[in-house]
Amino acid sequence: MSVLDRLTALFKTPVQREIKPLPATDVPHALGALLVRVALSDKQYAVQEIGQIDRVLAKFQNIGPIDAAKLRAECERLEAFAPNTPDFAHLLRKSVDYADRLGIVKALWQVVYADGALREVEADVMEITQSQLGIKSQDCAAAQADAQNQAAIDNASNLSS
């Protein structure tokens, strides 16, 4: 490396030096990016949401917590540069059967409720996503209610700990 190359490298931002290629948008990455996008929709990325995303990815991919965290990190990068939410949902709709898409909707609601609050912008993103996933409205309502009930149970057990 020449002196000029070394000097040029010093003036590059850390982001410019560490750019890695984005992962392919396959089903696991599309799911993870959707989870991250829903969590970020209220402009707050709570640690509870991050933990819930890791648990969902671990469950859906049958991987351990460290691999789930690595997958989430890839999905965070993908989400930042990826197309709009309906494109992720469309990929999942094409690739995943109805029962699994319904499971995805429930997982998305679990992330929404992980921080203990439902904000209007999150509800709006969920409405669009559920529609793009092709989930019936009564199934969406049931998935939301299940996630909300589970969040209440989780919050109550955390308070008593």
Q: Where are each of the predicted segments found?
A:
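Small-residue-enriched hydrophobic alpha-helices in membranes
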Residues: M1-R37, S41, A46-S161
